[in-house]
Regions:
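NAD(P)H-binding glycine-rich loop region in Rossmannoid oxidoreductase-like domains
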Residues: 34-84, 94-100
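Conserved Rossmann-fold NAD(P)-dependent oxidoreductase catalytic core, especially the SDR/UDP-sugar
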Residues: 69-113, 118-123, 127-128
C-alpha cells in the first residue's frame, strides 16, 4: 500500500507515519512547505490519503482560508489525476458548532468537511471523517495548542504553570487510540463519519494536580499505581516523554556492611515486568522503541552504555553505567534505545523493569538502529 499523509510533520502525522511504515506501507509525506505540484504528484500514486493538514491557531479569516484551502487543494489534485482513492480526514468536534464550539475554527473545519464530502459525491471516492476532541500523547508541541503538552513540559522541569478555568472539563483521546481509529477508518467502504472511542474527561484543575503528583513521586523513586491501559497510565507515559535528559537518571543510595551492599531500586505496589539481561562484551541489545511502554534499566554487573535518541531526531544521548556506581536510567516512550557492553572481558548484567507485560499480539516494539 502507498499512503499519502498531509500534515505529516505534525503531532498526529508523525505517529501515523510511523504506524504506517511499521505495517509495511510506503508513505509519502506532505507538509506545509511543499507545493501543489508535489501534492499532485503524490496524489497520482496514492492508494489512500490521510488528510491531517490544517490550521488551528490563527486569525478567524486565516483559519477559514487555511483549512478550507487545504481541503480544496487536495480534492483538486485528486480530481486532476483522476484518482478516486479513499480519503481519511481528521476534523474536530468543534465542527458541530454546538455551544462553545460555535467559533471560527469550528466553522472552518465544517466547511472543510463539506468540501471533501462534495468531492466524494462527485468522484465516487470514499471520504471518512474523524471528528476528534483534544488529543494527547508524546511528541505533542508544548505552549501551542495542547494544555496536556504544555503542563507536562513545564511540570517535568519544575516550572510554574498557569491554571485557568480550573472547572472546565476537557475531552481527550490518547494518540494511540487515534492512530488505531485512523487505520480502522481506512477499511471503511462508504463515506461518512467514523466512530471513535469514548474520550477521557477531566477538569483542567484535576489535570494539573495529577501531573504535579507525578513530579512529586519522581524525586522519591516511587512508581504510581497505574492500571494498564487506563487514562492515568497513558497520562503518566505522556508525562515521562517530556522529561529533560537530566531527569532520566535516578541516583540511588548504597548501604554497605560486612556482608556486602544493598540498594533499593524502586518502590511499587503493583504492575510491570522485571527481567534480567546478560550482554556479552561488545554486543548491543535493544535497538528499538515503544509507543507507550516505558522502562528502567539498572546495571548490576559489569559496565556499559545506554544510548537514547528521540524518534525522528539525530541527537544521541549517552549514559555510561557501571555496577560500581549504582544508577538507573528511565527509557521514555518514543525514544530509540540500545544497551552496549563496553567491557572487554566481562558480561554486562542489567535488571530491566517494563511498565507493561510483554504481549506478543501487541508488542509495542519497533525496530530502529541507533
Amino acid at each position: 500500500m502507498r499512503a499519502l499523509v498531509t500534515g505529516a510533520y505534525g503531532f498526529i502525522g508523525k505517529h501515523l507515519v510511523q504506524a504506517l511504515r511499521a505495517s509495511g506501507a510506503h508513505v509519502d509525506c506532505f507538509g506545509s512547505g511543499d507545493g501543489q505540484a508535489a501534492l499532485t504528484a503524490y496524489c497520482r500514486k496514492a492508494d489512500i490519503v490521510f488528510h491531517l493538514a490544517g490550521v488551528n491557531r490563527a486569525s478567524d479569516e486565516a483559519l477559514l482560508q487555511g483549512n478550507v484551502a487545504a481541503a480544496e487543494q487536495l480534492t483538486e489534485a485528486l480530481t486532476q489525476v483522476g484518482n478516486p482513492c479513499p480519503v481519511i480526514v481528521t476534523s474536530s468536534v468543534q465542527a458541530s458548532l454546538q455551544g462553545r464550539y460555535d467559533n471560527a475554527y469550528g466553522r472552518s473545519k465544517l466547511q472543510s468537511e463539506q468540501v471533501l464530502f462534495r468531492y466524494a459525491a462527485q468522484s465516487g471516492a470514499n471520504v471518512t471523517v474523524l471528528r476528534l476532541p483534544g488529543v494527547f500523547g508524546k511528541w505533542c508541541r508544548p505552549n501551542y495548542n495542547s494544555v496536556v503538552a504544555t503542563f507536562c513540559h513545564a511540570i517535568a522541569r519544575g516550572e510554574p504553570i498557569a491554571v485557568c478555568e480550573e472547572e472546565r472539563e476537557l475531552e481527550l483521546l490518547y494518540i494511540d487510540d487515534v492512530i488505531d481509529a485512523l487505520l480502522s477508518a481506512s477499511l471503511t467502504e462508504k463515506s461518512g463519519y467514523a466512530a471513535l472511542p469514548t474520550p477521557y474527561r477531566i477538569r483542567v484543575g484535576e489535570l494539573a494536580a495529577r501531573l504535579e503528583s507525578f513530579y512529586a513521586l519522581q524525586a522519591s523513586g516511587v512508581l504510581p499505581r497505574l492500571a494498564p491501559g487506563s487514562a492515568e497510565a497513558r497520562l503518566y507515559a505522556t508525562y515521562l516523554s517530556y522529561l529533560p535528559p537530566e531527569q532520566l537518571l535516578l541516583p540511588l543510595a548504597r548501604h554497605n556492611d560486612e556482608r556486602g551492599s544493598f540498594f533499593e531500586l524502586l518502590r511499587s505496589d503493583a504492575g510491570g515486568q522485571i527481567s534480567v539481561n546478560v550482554t556479552l562484551p561488545g554486543q548491543p541489545r535493544g535497538q528499538h522503541w515503544h509507543n507507550s511502554k516505558w522502562e528502567i534499566f539498572f546495571v548490576v554487573g559489569g559496565r556499559g552504555e545506554i544510548r537514547l535518541r528521540r524518534v525522528g531526531d539525530s541527537e544521541v544521548i549517552r549514559f555510561a553505567l557501571d555496577a560500581a556506581s549504582p544508577t538507573a536510567v528511565r527509557i521514555p516512550p518514543g525514544y530509540v534505545h540500545a544497551l552496549v557492553n563496553t567491557a572487554e572481558d566481562t558480561a554486562l548484567t542489567t535488571v530491566i523493569w517494563a511498565s507493561e507485560y510483554f504481549d506478543a499480539a501487541r508488542p509495542d516494539t519497533f525496530r530502529e538502529d541507533i
